[in-house]
UniProtKB/Swiss-Prot annotation:
It catalyses: (+)-lariciresinol + NADP(+) = (+)-pinoresinol + NADPH + H(+); (-)-secoisolariciresinol + NADP(+) = (+)-lariciresinol + NADPH + H(+); (-)-lariciresinol + NADP(+) = (-)-pinoresinol + NADPH + H(+). The active site is at K138. InterPro entries: NAD(P)-bd_dom_sf (IPR036291), NmrA-like (IPR008030), NmrA-type/Isoflavone_red_sf (IPR050608), PCBER-like (IPR045312). This is Bifunctional pinoresinol-lariciresinol reductase 2. Belongs to the NmrA-type oxidoreductase family. Isoflavone reductase subfamily. CDD domains: PCBER_SDR_a (cd05259). Coiled coil: none annotated.
Amino acid sequence: MEESSRVLIVGGTGYIGRRIVKASIALGHPTFILFRKEVVSDVEKVEMLLSFKKNGAKLLEASFDDHESLVDAVKQVDVVISAVAGNHMRHHILQQLKLVEAIKEAGNIKRFVPSEFGMDPGLMEHAMAPGNIVFIDKIKVREAIEAASIPHTYISANIFAGYLVGGLAQLGRVMPPSEKVILYGDGNVKAVWVDEDDVGIYTIKAIDDPHTLNKTMYIRPPLNILSQKEVVEKWEKLSGKSLNKINISVEDFLAGMEGQSYGEQIGISHFYQMFYRGDLYNFEIGPNGVEASQLYPEVKYTTVDSYMERYL
């Protein structure tokens, strides 16, 4: 029996990174977690690292500013997965260029998964500013990966359930509203809602799979392809409470960007892409893409219905 690939996870204490670490350990991969020396002053992250260590992970100290430490870490594994923070923290995405250089020098990596996990940046040339900067930076990382001929898989995980299912896609809210809910336009634009733990499982499933080599893997669980209105209706049925629905036009929604912080403007522009334009599901997967739930039907993914039960 072929041995499982050794996996290095960069950003393993982050929101999605911790799920990938958990999945890697659960699926039997020798798991390594890169951590920066600055982390030792953060008690919560240290506790998380020690918990992973207790479960079998190996901790490797390295820094984006220390090329040799990165190369040394990369040489110990077969696969590198980056889950560094994106969003308005754009410098973290571009720091992956240093990781690409280390992987290129090490020369032993069989697969690299860069930090994407949201909308496919390769399809977002039209994206609105300032939210487009996230996609621009991710494309720069892709270009570096491909120029270095590094075997890779890009992952488009769509909407993280923890951020938007509970809050019914209300900006700045992650728990269900009790009285009213804003619907974007008519609320009927289809989106894809994915449990973060499932993102971790699908990611680890993909790293040794030849079907995902040098392709984009889209995570589209069929039962979770739902409009915002459908998600709201599911919550109303589950909770037994009706909400006052307020439709907001695209013009009024975008007018709300004025006077907001840079980070909030990025969030608003991403909501526009998802819930007005429908950029999560307004395209067919092409020959350079694959779909996770079709590749791995054995994964019992979490449906939106069952995810919502935790909020009762």
